[in-house]
Amino acid sequence: MSIEQLARKTVRELTPYQSARRLGGSGDIWLNANESPFANEYSVTCGRLNRYSECQPADLIQAYADYAGIDSKQVLTSRGADEGIELLIRTFCEPNQDSILYCPPTYGMYAISAETFDIKTKTVPLTPEWQLDLPSIQNNLDGVKLVFVCSPNNPTGNVMNRRDIEKLLDMTTDKALVVIDEAYIDFCLETSTVDLLAKYPHLVILRTLSKAFALAGLRCGFTLANTDVINLLLKVIAPYPVPVPVADIAVQALSVAGRARTKFQVLDISANRAYLQAGLGMLSGVTVYDGYGNYLLVKFTHADALFTALWNHGIILRRSPIENCIRISVGNRDECEKTLAFIRAHVTSQGNSSQDSASKSNSSANNDELNASN
């Protein structure tokens, strides 16, 4: 029996998540992983590396609880929000029996995490406006333990209607947990659902330091929920999920000074997002969708050709599962200017080529008519 045959059937058939790093590429401008353009410095001490870390470092838990405005007993930290997704699935779903529900187009790890653990998946596509299709969700709740909603949504960038989220919470009471993925919420904190934790015991919120806090390489995420949920997750989580240096750096990032710096950087990124949106929106045949995170979803007439041209030029963006769309992470101003300039030149060139082709076609047609009349 081969090594491949020894693996679980589910794993053999699994298509792994195509992360930006896994897809690769080489260039000077990387705007494909929704990373922050800021590389902040932190102090790291090595005096405790001979000791295991706490399962849930008290200083880190308290620091994030203070930031989120909730009780420390409502916070669990993990290796990124992705581990939070897995913990929820492993804790609440029975393999080959229960299901999760999610609403594409959205983050791909919900499905992959479920499939890895032999959990069924149900999909209810977003509406044409990329909002929740509540009637269809309600019709598909049988056997569902977890409903995942990403807001701001990746890759579309929009925020889910708050009233719809409350209706979803009402319809899932005593049936399923609703998991709101707020990975990008620090760019629009006013839209957070964290205040709803006090009303809905089955609400769970996922957070991360990877985006606005510019710590993607740290792998530090948080699950916010009521204590009944947190206590169950603590039964499943690994004994030492957060390394000592990770906790130390995260606490610094969540300090008063760290939060002030993040707020300033969010304003800078938001300004660059507006710059990109305005510039791209002026181009013919280009549709820029409103974004609330650190990225924009943009529709082009010839998206594949543009993506390849950018890639070959060393500007690495992210292809979207949405037809003719590319997702562009918001970088620093220099990166945004160079990306916009290349796209503008390419789109203009494509437009001129189309016009030339149309002129030649019309000219040929006119000549044919003249010849026919002669």
Curated annotation (Swiss-Prot):
GO terms for biological process: L-histidine biosynthetic process. InterPro entries: Aminotrans_II_pyridoxalP_BS, Aminotransferase_I/II_large, HisP_aminotrans, PyrdxlP-dep_Trfase, PyrdxlP-dep_Trfase_major, PyrdxlP-dep_Trfase_small. It catalyses: L-histidinol phosphate + 2-oxoglutarate = 3-(imidazol-4-yl)-2-oxopropyl phosphate + L-glutamate. Pathway: Amino-acid biosynthesis; L-histidine biosynthesis; L-histidine from 5-phospho-alpha-D-ribose 1-diphosphate: step 7/9. It is an enzyme of class 2 (transferase). The keyword Translocase does not apply. Residues 351-374 are annotated as: Disordered. Residues 351-368 have a biased composition (Low complexity). The modification N6-(pyridoxal phosphate)lysine is found at residue 211. Pfam families: Aminotran_1_2 (PF00155). Its cofactor is pyridoxal 5'-phosphate. The keyword Transferase applies. One of its GO terms (molecular function) is pyridoxal phosphate binding. It comes from the Bacteria. Keywords: Amino-acid biosynthesis, Aminotransferase, Histidine biosynthesis, Pyridoxal phosphate, Transferase. Its EC number is 2.6.1.9. Belongs to the class-II pyridoxal-phosphate-dependent aminotransferase family. Histidinol-phosphate aminotransferase subfamily. PANTHER family: HISTIDINOL-PHOSPHATE AMINOTRANSFERASE, HISTIDINOL-PHOSPHATE AMINOTRANSFERASE-RELATED. Homodimer. This is Histidinol-phosphate aminotransferase. It comes from Photobacterium profundum (strain SS9).
